[in-house]
Amino acid sequence: SLLLSYQTILAHYIHGKPSSWKSLEKPKFICPVPGFDRHFRIFDDFDIEVITVPLIEDGVDLAKLKNVLDENQNVMGIICVPRHSNPSGEVYTDENINGIFSIGKAYSDKFLFLFDHAYLIHDFLPTKKQTPTWQLALNNDTNNQTVIVTSFSKVTFGGGGLSFLAADGDNLDLIKKTRLSMVICPDKINQQRHVDLFKNKEAIESHMTKHANLIRPKFETSYEILGSISDDYGTFSKPTGGYFITYKTSKPIASKVIELCSMLGVSLTPAGATFPNSNDPNNNIIRIAPTFIDEDELKIAMDVFITSVQVAHLGPVSYTHLTLPTNVAV
């Protein structure tokens, strides 16, 4: 889905109608934050300015989105992860997606709505229902402005799954035009492998249930350990699917926490990575990936993390008030 997202932006940059984006003065694109670092890199490659809008519980902050569009010219579109958003896990409501469509459409009938549905079927706990995004696009008469991408990269093998794209009108024509110059044909053997394994919807759902059973305990362990220290130190997201947790420190100490963890042998996503140019303006967002290691290692890593949060929060003072796990010493 990342490659299809890139090719969608490339298509508009080179062949966009009525004007290619490369011919415009200071084109811009909106990214909700905290967000996916690879999305930011796409726009860096094309020297497209990224404008951020905050995420709230139900999706994008619509008031901030409208303000951004009211104050800026040549905003070409918005990219969203509408289900289990990376890294904080928001699941957009239908009302929020409808609002995004309404505000963007009012700004321009060429405004691009790019949805990266990387975690479309990746629930591991009960998750709110969503109307299919393409149906919402049809309902809002924005199907000619909408591109939805997803893949099986996190279903079968990373980088080795099948990818899918939904688009219409000029968007579909532009993407096809660009891809036809790049790709002779898809990997048909890989397609056949997937068809042989996933013969129907039920087979896919059964497979994802197995994924959920592997992943859920790791998240529950993480929630328990993160919840063992006071909210005075920070708060954390509790996603019902996807692959990440976001920890928000109450002080601007994210970089210090990550440094302390690294000193103790725990590697985390670099500070600032969930913002454009790796610049977290408040230095307080940390992305946690519980799925990477086994559960025993995860418990140790999370103990290191909460200890590092407390040490960084308290600074050079006595640590008598720390909530310390038994296997971590300061």
Give short role names for the model-derived ranges:
Residues 246-251, 268-302, 308:
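Conserved PLP-binding active-site segment of the aspartate aminotransferase-like
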Residues 117-118:
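Conserved Walker B
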Residues 77, 112, 147:
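Hydrophobic "anchor" residues on beta-strands that sit immediately upstream
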